[in-house]
């Protein structure tokens, strides 16, 4: 029903002659969207490691093909090409993985046979990946990032519904030109504003109302607004030619903060420091000392 391509590297993906792995239509339709499902791991592709079902005791065990039956049961709007890029919990995704996700995504989107892209991802760092892609991907095609709060073998998993919602959005012409979108719990969020607000709840991303620009209601896609900031095709950044990232540390300021963390960052060779400061950009005395040391 679905195609695989172990050659996910851009030099292979950009060859349109390799685009022979799309699934056959699940039900009758004259024009189905051709979507790439790019898997990176996360809870959506995880199963519990023991019978007790601990909230933390599960691991990534499923390929993206294993998630497709849930879509076929409801009738799909698209044909799929599956790419298993990683099988990682998202707290283990680093800058090298992030760069690879961006490069592979861009290569697929550049293929004229592809109508849109869905990325399955763990929710712990989903917002970082979505935001990075929103700044660096050059395409007006729909790009949707989705995941799950519950593992696939949970008695009531949310992954299938999230994936079906992602398919509906990625298949919708209305999603074109809106940048990278996050689809979870029937909400459509813009990547530039979304943030995980709850550790375990199904509505973990729902608290950022300013980020929610639409909904998936009964399989129908409804947009109420559109992102206003530059993104994707109009972004000042691009994935093209990017080969790595400088090391930048994030240091939180707080009462009685010390300058030692700034000194350690500089000594370790970081290229920059982002200070997560207090209201109106205020810094504690220790942070001011550390920032001045780092600036020298």
Predicted regions and their residues:
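Short acidic, glycine-rich surface-loop motifs adjacent to enzyme active sites
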Residues: 111-126, 268-280
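Accessory alpha-helical/coil subdomains and C-terminal extensions
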Residues: 31-34, 38-44, 60-74, 190-280
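Proline-centered loop/turn at the N-terminus of a beta-strand
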Residues: 34, 116, 141-144, 179
